[in-house]
Amino acid sequence: ECFFNRGSAKRLVVFFSGARTRNGGRDLAPFPTFSSWSWGSETNASVLCIDDPMFYNYPALPLGWFNGTEKEDYREYVASLVCEISRLLGVQTRDITLYGRSGGGTAAIAVCGFISESSAVAINPQLDIAKYPYNEKFTPITGINKSDEAFLKRNNFENIIKQHKKNTFLIISNAASKIDYDIDINFLSAKFGANLKYGLSCLDNLCLWQYYACGEPDPHSAFDNPALFRMIMAVLELIKAKNIDGAALLASFANEYWADRYELLMRKREINQKAVSRGGEIKALKDQISEKEKVISEKNKEISALKKRMHESLFAKIRRALRKLFNK
């Protein structure tokens, strides 16, 4: 399924959905999920959001990468859909940007390979899929063998990038994310001989952008927000215009904002956790005080009863003494 918002410019941005997992991977969100569907106001381009069709065939699947079945390549179908929509809009393929995060970024790169001169922006994508933890669920649910020739060809991202020189691939990775660093950043370094550095570096049609953000709730999920999206799109346009120095400068400013934003989110969470903890402590103290007040109330009742008995006993003794006195 898709969500579409028409813009005023002859440009098209396509957002791809990623994993359906929520609450630390414990739950699956219902589908369809349209990533960044409300961001049409952040750009004058038309915006197309596409949910992963894998979820319709495999409802228990947490992440499908738009892979398809053993015989059908869903990414090729999606590329045909994007090209038809761009034709109707009068958008040239060089003005198509395929955009995704995590598994959506993986799909963006793959679909880009089917659309000549298009661009892909992928934030923390999975590039060496065979090493990714979700593989434990992918094969049992889909029945797709990851050693199958079609699967390997579809997910050979080295070839996709190297064989499509007219396309622009901007891969953005969080150096603070262990899983992205250990698997995908090392993959890029090994396959492309990239001398990775903090900030932006370009190798032919591939540009690598390293940022560092602590992450909320985790570094892998330290994705962009509307402000960063606008900066990323501006960096992409500078890259396409061969103004790499300008792109690198803007990326460095974006990195500062990116790091500060998630640092503030982390502090906010810590403050909230402390507030919750303090709230719990205060509640516990209030409960203790309430229990003490109950005990004191019971003691006061006992004291009142004892005083009453003492008074009654004293009056009785006085009455007996008076009777004896008057009887004499």
Show the residue positions of the predicted features.
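Boundary detector for helix-to-coil junctions that initiate low-complexity/charged tails
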Residues: 262-328
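The feature captures the conserved acid-bearing segment of alpha/beta-hydrolase catalytic domains
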Residues: 130-211, 215-231, 236-241, 245
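Alpha/beta-hydrolase fold nucleophile elbow
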Residues: 91-102
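Glycine-rich nucleophile elbow surrounding the catalytic serine of serine-hydrolase chemistry
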Residues: 100-110
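Cap/lid segment of the alpha/beta-hydrolase catalytic domain
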Residues: 48-73
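Active-site nucleophile loop of the alpha/beta-hydrolase fold
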Residues: 122-131
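Short, surface-exposed "cap/lid" segments of acyl-processing enzymes
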Residues: 1-45, 49, 53-57
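Alpha/beta-hydrolase active-site loop
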Residues: 65-88
